[in-house]
């Protein structure tokens, strides 16, 4: 209806919009990547990073433990804040891509800031990207790959995770790529 969700009281939201807690309840016992949307171009942009504080507070209150979560965001400041608040919860930087001449410096910066993964756009990922991340101790989880042949290629290169709209296809590709 055009309202900005972050500016609406929960009691006024439609029933089909859930809280983070409710969404996480639905995901038990899965490992969950919580993506924080905090883009300066969005009407609900939060320069104070209180969204990071609220997300960490929600995850810490839950009984499952910190190793069940990974927090990702396109905004480095957001994941940096999450890392400052709770270093035991894994964090990852989402990116469309990084200039080749800056790539190693970016990876070193992610490691220095305590982040555990890079989440690059699927068209940015190469064997060299994955190898460089792994050499820095970072996992690589790409987004959004729905093409089975590209999934197979990424798996053969050692990708750690694939975000997809077709999880059934991804599981088939993974199972075919893995020796029995």
Give the residues covered by each predicted segment.
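An active-site metal/cofactor-coordinating segment within enzyme catalytic domains
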Residues: 1-31, 36-46, 50, 90-95, ...
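Conserved, mostly hydrophobic/aromatic
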Residues: 13, 23, 34, 75, ...
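Alpha-helical scaffolding within the catalytic cores
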Residues: 17-23, 76, 101-105, 126
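Acidic (Asp/Glu)-rich catalytic clusters
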Residues: 22-32, 57-65, 80-86, 107-114, ...
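Structural detector of well-ordered beta-strand residues that form the stable sheet scaffold
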Residues: 33, 70-72, 92, 141
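Charged helix-capping and loop-helix junction motifs
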Residues: 47-54, 106-107
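Active-site-adjacent structural elements that line small-molecule/cofactor binding pockets in enzymes
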Residues: 71, 81, 89-94, 105
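C-terminal active-site rim and adjoining tail of enzyme catalytic domains
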Residues: 92-180
